[in-house]
């Protein structure tokens, strides 16, 4: 991994959010992470992985799956102790990505990324605006593989930690897996 930022319009910004739930009107972001890759999806740098403070009232609104998952992975404890709010997390994330990719050049990259984009639009609008309007969504390829070549999916191994940085790395590995087994680029 390169630790010296090199601004390149072909670099890709990968992002993942963990939220208290999926309802845009009632739920909030509790973690954000970013990774920069080159155009061949080689990881160049990992951005900050930031737990975002939310009140106990907000945390109590989570459903049982979220409570279980984010207690098990330690995120709820990190959220309770965090000094970050959404604005500070957005500023630090923008500082990181802007040293690697110019404004408006990278699609938003990840898995099921449109839902994350909705939360960014509401809670971190300056960050959402930084991305190109297009997206690179690994879930689209997964859905095609599920329909056209389902046997390959049994070979795909993911961590499923529901930690933002781990989820990004899983998405990158998944895309590379599809490149080798499904898309088969030479």
From Swiss-Prot:
Chief subcellular location: cytoplasm
GO biological process terms on file: DNA metabolic process
Keyword annotations from UniProtKB, A to Z: Cytoplasm, Exonuclease, Hydrolase, Nuclease
Top-level taxonomic group: Bacteria
Domain Exonuclease: 12-175
EC number(s) stated in the UniProt entry for this protein: 3.1.15.-
InterPro entries from the UniProt entry: Exonuclease_RNaseT/DNA_pol3 (IPR013520), Oligoribonuclease (IPR022894), RNaseH-like_sf (IPR012337), RNaseH_sf (IPR036397)
Coiled coil: none
Gene3D superfamilies per the UniProt record, alphabetical: Ribonuclease H-like superfamily/Ribonuclease H
Disulphide bridges: none
SUPFAM superfamilies: Ribonuclease H-like
Gene Ontology CC entries for this record: cytoplasm
Active site positions: 133
One MF term in the entry's GO annotations: 3'-5'-RNA exonuclease activity
Compartment(s) where it occurs, according to its Swiss-Prot or TrEMBL record: Cytoplasm
Biological role stated in the UniProt entry: 3'-to-5' exoribonuclease specific for small oligoribonucleotides.
Family: Belongs to the oligoribonuclease family.
Protein name: Oligoribonuclease
